[in-house]
Amino acid sequence: MQKRGLLASSIVYVVVLLFVTSVAFENPAFSQVQEKGPHIDQARFIHRTDDNLALEEVKSGSLDMYFFPIPHEAANDARNDPRLKVYDTTAGSLGFFVNPAPAADPNILNPFQFKEVRYALNYLIDRDFVVNEILKGYGSPLIDPFGIYSPEYLNIIETVESFGFRYNPSLASSMISDAMIAAGATNSGGRWVFNGNTVTINLFMRQDDPKKVSMGELVASELEKIGFSIQRDYGDLNKANTVVYGSDPKNLQWQIYTEEFAGSRAFVKYNPTIPAQMYAPWLSRMPGSQNPTYWNYQNATLDEITQKIAFFNFTSEQERNQLVSDAVKMGIQESVRIFVAQKTDPFVASANVRGLVNDFGAGITSKYSLLNVRSGGDGNLSLDIGVKQIHQGSWNTIGGLQDLYSASIHSMVADTATFRHPYTGEVIPFRSPWTDITTEGPVDKIDLPSDVIKWNQTLQQWVQAGEGSTAISKVTFTPLYSKWHHGIQMNVSDMMYADYFTYEWGTNTGPGDRTVDAEYTPAVSEALKLSKGSRYVAPDRIESYIDIWHYDEKEIAGSGAFFATEPWEVLAASERIVTDGRLAYSRSEAQAKGIEWYDPIVREHAEMVKGELQKMKNEQFVPPALRGIITIEEAVKRYDASISWIENHGHAIIGNGAFYLDNFNVAGGTITINAFRDFSYPFEVGHWSQYETPQLAEISSVNVPRIVTISQPTPITVNVEVSGRPSSNATVNYFVSNKDGIVVARGEAQPESPGQFNIDLTSEMAAKLSPGPNQIKIFATSNEALRPDISSSTILAAPGALGSSQGTNNKHQVSGDISAVNTEQ
């Protein structure tokens, strides 16, 4: 991943969404002197396909933890086993990805090309059955991309509740029949026929996960009942990358896919990318992937709305929240991606392991966990971690790292400009801490200094900002350089090359432009419209000028600050290979051209990088973007270091993180990362310990009248604890719904005393209640950890003067018996 920051990073979740082998870097004794990096010296990721076997290995001590959910039916026993500790994660989801393309063959009918048929699936899918039977109660029904535990959920709850989806196969069948008949299909003998051909649906199921197979069989059974023939196909994520995400949708190699997201790579308070990733074509995550040679799903309205969210094109918090709500509403109506269940996934680690950070987005697979983990009592400085898959997609930083397995490991070896607080989701400084944020937004502008520069692809040189150039905001940051893992010190040349790459590959100058990728370029081009240039004040001080404003200034910093995550020479070598047509950065580009997806962790591709580096050395090559910045001698030194690294490690993953990737053993199914102990690394051992324990809120009681008189004001009291003590360091929101599920009142409870919050249900609010049962949902969130505790109570409303004896709520946990996005899993 290159120029990080929301400007590139608001698309990097989804789009671009990174040693010399001297003994000093690998010597544990040396590491103890330097006290830099993680507590542990080594982590070994070991392929385990059987979840039950992996659980037994954690029990026995053969594995220290398992970076994949254990079977739900085994979770209760695991909680009672003193050898284990269970960590619950609630960020993941299950659903269906639906192909809306008309068939290339006019005699073949794809029912899902009709929005009405796709939408009807929401009534054909029994979400409660999925939660209760397939997930064994470890989850909750879901129809939106955020889920009830996301900070964004409070912005969309009224929209979500308004759909009122319930399992209703008769209604679904009627809706589908109307659409099929209108399209010219007939139902003969209980089977749908079009132009003499049986209407067949190609259903792709992930066979590497039983719950996805069960979900697939569930929807297959329902579709067969209403007259469709089902062609079942099975495979893992590797196959899905080809069949589902990499093929031309009009060829109908797939029509429904059982899709799972493991959650986001980090917890995000104001998630700018999820609406676009899940619903909008422009981000290259919808059918067709924006590949110009394919049929592509198109929705200009969703593109416009989600781009405003992604690039902060709003003037207030209220406007942004409305945009998010509008995007979710239209996405649900379009039903190209249908969400079914939010998962509560139990992960396990040995009870001897200390310091894991259960990030609200990534769970214990977060970057923070291995930065802070330690093994208690036995002096063990090496951990063995079971993983479900060892290699399911490309590790290239431009169009790869899209699956849980590669992303979680890669995050350990490459640091980014900023990161996210694991419990509040706020932007925090990482390798490019900001020293100043200046903004005149949302309306006014800053005049740019004359020495602000940006890369001009046509001229192939850096150009200065023109006279009269302006920007909404300026972020000043100071990169924390260290040595790359191959031993060469990072410097401003790496920053400038990352800056260059975003412009070069984010701009399409037309036919003949070889620095274009079908997925990366269209997404990045939208971000580039907001980049006004960079000012390299000093090697370690950079000013970034952007047309971005946010009501939370930390989000501006996260947008403007960037950091290089791989050495410029490795990126330059890959460019030469890709522009030569030998490999492609993105999955769909590779498939369309009939070439391989560039994957620097694979030895064969690393050898290609090595060969290109040797050519660059022989040519005395200096990239145009770095001419006048580095000397030939400096370039050659870089080439030699990267060549040596590839020769010694068999891959081209060269990062700057707290760990380096030592080796990828394909036959043995292992990836080994070792601590990077060089004194240049900026963070000492124990730096991240503050994130070990979240301060969670809990609703201890809700006092609500059993019967409420319509149109009469009603007081409600909510008692809240934070970390086990009554506290007002929390936010309490409430939503009242009538008998039809429509939200008729909402608000924020006010603190009366430590731990006591008052809700004043006014006469105007009470007038909107339905006679009979209504519902009040209460969300209590600690201000230090934004995972809500949720209470739901029934309010019986009646006209006239009736008794109002007090009762307490029937508090329930939305996730079944467990108390309380995204990478593909």
Model-assigned labels for residue ranges:
Residues I274-Q277, F347-Q392, Q402-Y405, Y660-I671, ...:
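Long beta-strand-rich cores associated with HINT superfamily self-processing modules
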Residues L55-I70, A75, R79-L84, K225-S284, ...:
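Periplasmic binding protein-like
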Residues A54-S62, I108-A120, L124, I446-P511, ...:
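Aromatic- and charge-enriched surface segment that lines or borders ligand/interaction sites
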Residues F30-D41, E73-A74, N80, P111, ...:
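Surface-exposed, Gly/Pro/Thr- and Asp/Glu-enriched linker/hinge segments
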Residues H47, Y119, V131, Q231-A240, ...:
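Extracytoplasmic/peripheral linker and loop segments enriched in polar/acidic and small residues
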Residues Q113-S221, K225, D326, N372-R374, ...:
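Append "and occasionally in soluble cytosolic enzymes with long acidic Gly/Pro-rich linkers
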Residues Q32-N76, S229-Q231, V492, E684-Q712, ...:
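Ligand-site clamp/hinge motif
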Residues K36-G37, H47, I70-S177, V193-I201, ...:
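Local pocket/hinge segments that shape ligand/substrate recognition
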